């Protein structure tokens, strides 16, 4: 059974919250290898910053290092290298990291390049952040601000059954109303930035606050 960690928006300057650090350390401490899947496949400089850090941004590798995870081999895939990328590496790495950014671009990137078959065969620990967490669901909810027309569901990667709304703010009435208006077809979970969902087979652990909106 896959182990999945769904994150909303970790602080790029401070790293993961303590509870999330403990979860990552418990599952991944030691020397590891990682594949990072871009959610902005054409924005190479942005992708490099997300993974390796720059200026005031720690980057994924340093943030994992703060959890006592030493990344020895890093594979960042975007449109620079996807044509030459060896998909069998998905079967060998310890971590598959779905990066934050544009959920629609990431969804299309994974599907168009036939990555999902290999991801589903992999035993790697899966981490999703923001857009990456959104796409892990069977049904991915895309808010209006991502589309500039209206909110909708698209087919996700089917790695879990939790459709999340990242960066959720219960005091943002526009966001709350949008979720309420769109939870008729599928359940939705509003996940604030300091929250997470950890899935280990049939065991599900929620870290900090979350807001469940049931379909009718």
Give each language-model segment a name.
Residues 1-30, 38-51, 55, 140-216:
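C-terminal and late-domain segments of enzyme folds
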Residues 23, 112-124:
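Catalytic-core regions built around general acid/base machinery
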Residues 31, 92-93, 122-123, 160:
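Short, well-ordered alpha-helix to beta-strand connector turns
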Residues 34, 96, 130, 164, ...:
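A residue-level signal for conserved active-site and pocket-lining positions in enzyme catalytic cores
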Residues 44-103:
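A glycine-rich, hydrophobic loop/mini-helix early in the fold
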Residues 97-99, 121-139:
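Catalytic nucleophile loop
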Residues 103-111:
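Glycine/threonine-rich flexible loop motifs
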């Amino acid at each position: 059974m896959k182990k999945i960690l769904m994150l909303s928006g970790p602080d790029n300057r401070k790293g993961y919250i303590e509870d999330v650090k403990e979860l990552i350390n418990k599952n991944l401490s030691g020397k590891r290898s990682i594949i990072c899947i871009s959610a902005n496949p054409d924005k190479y400089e942005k992708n490099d910053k997300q993974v390796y850090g720059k200026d005031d941004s720690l980057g994924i590798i340093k943030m994992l290092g703060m959890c006592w995870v030493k990344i020895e081999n890093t594979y960042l895939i975007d449109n620079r290298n996807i044509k030459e990328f060896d998909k069998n590496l998905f079967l060998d790495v310890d971590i598959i990291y779905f990066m934050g950014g544009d959920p629609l671009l990431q969804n299309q990137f994974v599907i168009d390049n036939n990555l999902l078959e290999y991801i589903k065969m992999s035993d790697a620990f899966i981490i999703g952040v923001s857009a990456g967490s959104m796409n892990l669901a069977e049904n991915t909810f895309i808010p209006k601000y991502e589309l500039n027309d209206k909110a909708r569901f698209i087919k996700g990667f089917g790695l879990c059954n939790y459709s999340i709304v990242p960066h959720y703010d219960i005091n943002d009435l526009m966001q709350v109303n949008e979720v309420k208006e769109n939870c008729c077809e599928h359940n939705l979970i509003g996940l604030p930035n300091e929250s997470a969902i950890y899935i280990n087979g049939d065991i599900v652990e929620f870290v900090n606050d979350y807001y469940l909106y049931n379909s009718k």
